[in-house]
Amino acid sequence: MADGDHNADLRRLIRTIPDHPKPGIQFRDITTLLLDPVGLATATERMLASVEGPVDLVAGIEARGFVFAPALALALGAGVLLIRKDGKLPGATIAEDYELEYGVDRIAIHVDACAPGARVLLVDDLIATGGTARAAVRLLRKAGARVTQANFVIDLPELGGADALRAEGITVSALVAFDGH
C-alpha cells in the first residue's frame, strides 16, 4: 500500500513547502523526486510493482499524472489516456464536473479515448480529498472503461481521498503517505 521503511528513500526526495498555496497547507512537491534519476526510476518501478493484472490503458490526470503514465504504460504494454482540464482537448470530448474548495472544475477525455470494457489504471502524483480522481473514475466509467485500480506517488490519508476511491471499488496504491494537508 503505502510507505513504511521500504519507501523512505523516496520520501526523502519529496520536498515539503509550508503554507503553499495558502497558510496551513503543506505542499508536497515531487519535482525534487523527478530531478533525481535514481529516485524517478525507483518510484516508477515501485508503482509498476503494485499493478494487478493486465491493463489496456494507463490514464494520467493532468498535469503530474502525465509524468508517470507513459513510463508505466510502456512497461505494461498499454496505451496512455490523457485526462485533461476541460477545453484543452481538440475535437469531441466527454466531461465530468468535480467540486473544488471554492467552486467547480471539469475534466475531459476524447469521446473515442477508450474502447468499452478497456481495463484502465488511473495514475496521478498525489491523492488528497480525491475529488479529481473520483471525477476521473466517473468520466472513464461513463466512457465504458473498467477502472479497478489507481496508483499515486503520495497519499494524504487524513483527507480521505484514497478511502473514497476504495469505497467505489478501486484498489488504491501509494508509495508514501504524509500526515496533514
What kind of region is each of these model predictions?
Residues 1-181:
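PRPP-associated nucleotide enzymes
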